[in-house]
Amino acid sequence: MKALKDFMRMKHEGEKISMLTAYDYPSAKQAEAAEIDMILVGDSLGMTVLGYESTVDVTLDDMKHHARAVRRGAKDTYVVVDMPFGTIGIDASTDTAFAIELYRDTHANAIKIEGAHAAPVIKKCHDIGIPVVAHLGLTPQSYGITGYQLQATSKEAAKQLIEDAKLVEKSGAIMLVLEAIPSDLAHVITESLTIPVIGIGAGVGTNGQVLVYHDVLNYGVEHKPKFVKRYGDFSIGVESIKNFHDEVKRQAFPTEEYTYKKQIMNEVDE
């Protein structure tokens, strides 16, 4: 399993870091088999696999359930798990208690926290030994305020984001995720920090990239953001299911090939 020192080395040597967002045992097993550097158990699971309207509906128990499944599927991969909405922003002590619970109960390698406002919690977690990945730019838990759109598009907002990035690093974040910001800004932030920066919709100038398993494979997702590239097409699964349905109706399945050959009723009748 890669450790933080490996990700720091990769940043300094210019080797890009791959991160995949996955939510369950089989996707985690596939990610590990593909030698992905890191897995993120994101609260985006709310919309992607639970059918919620937004990440706001995701609970701490949801995150625990899915993170445990990912950990079982990827025992030798660095796993990061999201702190869900409602667990950050209460007060530093309560927030930290939630962080301890999630970190302890999932056996993740790190937790991820959205927003620069969480800097005090990041520091508390750092002080007690919980690695924290910070998340700036488009922060889905705040979509009601920021919207799902490109962030930091004004000079003032860009300057603020640079300051926020420096703040979370100073507070003890081990890594930073930048989402949906101009690529030149992401590059400047990446170069200004000593910690690795992972981008999603932030251009090529970051230290690595993250995409969601379901987006990569076109698996059950309806919306395709600009920054998503499809590397496979699981949408053909609908046709496969339809074929199964049709064969059942036509009594074309199961054939002898898929039927156990042992006969038992003669013995029962004796």
From Swiss-Prot:
- Chief subcellular site? cytoplasm
Compartments reported by the entry? Cytoplasm
Q: Where does 3-methyl-2-oxobutanoate bind?
A: 43-44, 82, 112
- E.C. number: 2.1.2.11
Task: Name the domain of life this protein comes from.
Answer: Bacteria
Cofactor(s) the protein needs:
Mg(2+)
Which reaction is the catalytic activity of this chain? 3-methyl-2-oxobutanoate + (6R)-5,10-methylene-5,6,7,8-tetrahydrofolate + H2O = 2-dehydropantoate + (6S)-5,6,7,8-tetrahydrofolate
Kindly give the InterPro entries that the UniProt entry links to this protein.
Pantoate_hydroxy_MeTrfase (IPR003700), Pyrv/PenolPyrv_kinase-like_dom (IPR015813), Pyrv_kinase-like_dom_sf (IPR040442)
Which EC class heads this enzyme's classification? transferase
**Gene3D superfamilies per the UniProt record, alphabetical:** Phosphoenolpyruvate-binding domains (3.20.20.60)
Give yes or no: UniProt keyword DNA-binding. no
Which residues of the sequence carry a binding annotation for Mg(2+)? 43, 82, 114
Q: What does UniProt list as catalytic?
A: 179 (proton acceptor)
According to the UniProt record, one GO cellular component term is: cytoplasm
Q: In which pathway does it act?
A: Cofactor biosynthesis; (R)-pantothenate biosynthesis; (R)-pantoate from 3-methyl-2-oxobutanoate: step 1/2
Keyword list (alphabetical) reads:
Cytoplasm, Magnesium, Metal-binding, Pantothenate biosynthesis, Transferase
What's the family?
Belongs to the PanB family.
Q: How does it assemble?
A: Homodecamer; pentamer of dimers.
Concerning PANTHER family, the annotation shows:
3-METHYL-2-OXOBUTANOATE HYDROXYMETHYLTRANSFERASE
Protein name from the UniProt record:
3-methyl-2-oxobutanoate hydroxymethyltransferase
Q: Which organism is it from?
A: Oceanobacillus iheyensis (strain DSM 14371 / CIP 107618 / JCM 11309 / KCTC 3954 / HTE831)
Taxonomic lineage is: Bacteria, Bacillati, Bacillota, Bacilli, Bacillales
The encoding gene? panB
